């Protein structure tokens, strides 16, 4: 990793696919363009996403996860043991290809190495983050038709994810984020769910980040310091920063990724609003331990709005950096 400024800015993972990529995917499904043409479109989309992140001033970018339709489906298609029967309605007219576990989970081959290698080759910084869905969330968002209990399923998934993470490190990944948005939804699972995440990152030599967002933080707060990761990033903006008091109460001692952008609202935060929110966060945590990020992935927004939100996030962070510099902090 290269040296980062004080209050590094990053994204959670996903970013809106360019419209032309969505059209290329449609044409490929219709048999009107080749696999090679589709891969070229994916590569071009990664370049476009990284350009947006660069222009916005993001310190730690991702490739926008543009090759992934969905955060669980992508991995279920590539890990042995899953089967898809068809779409399941989530709400309204929204459908999800919910996978089913029908046999023992086994790791087959690298799933993310190629996409990371390409993104690394075109990235403007070696502080590139790669994201992977964690074992608990994959299990929670799937049907279990094979294992006697969910815990056994989750720990087998943790072993598979661990192999993938180690392959990413071998390919040069320095910052790896495990996405576990489901970890804090069932109180009775949290203690062993944390153990499963630790199994997934066992023996990994990289900067490890975990993402949790919408759910009941009080379920997971007592266990956060047990996680073998360097940083945990949270959705704060949507909760009006109330979880900060909870984290302080439980003595949270890791790096804090602070969500300051609402990804479910098309309203674009102003840079001063972001700066005020960061000042609020710094009442609870020292700036050396704080990173700045959106609440969650940006893929559900339009590309224009997502980009403008990142610009506000970065500009607001710069305002606070200058204030800290005047107080004697080294910010570069």
From Swiss-Prot:
Top EC class for this record: transferase
Residue ranges of coiled coil: none
Pathway(s): Amino-acid biosynthesis; L-methionine biosynthesis via de novo pathway
Enzyme Commission (EC) number: 2.1.1.-
Cofactor binding mode and count: Binds 1 zinc ion per subunit.
GO molecular function, one term: 5-methyltetrahydropteroyltriglutamate-homocysteine S-methyltransferase activity
Binding site residues for Zn(2+): 211, 213, 296
Gene3D superfamilies: 3.20.20.210
A Gene Ontology biological process term: methylation
Domain of life: Archaea
UniProt key word Methyltransferase: yes
Entry function: Catalyzes the transfer of a methyl group to L-homocysteine resulting in methionine formation. The physiological methyl donor is unknown.
Protein name (record): Methionine synthase
Source species of the chain: Saccharolobus islandicus (strain L.S.2.15 / Lassen #1)
Lineage, highest ranks first: Archaea, Thermoproteota, Thermoprotei, Sulfolobales, Sulfolobaceae
Gene assigned in the entry: metE
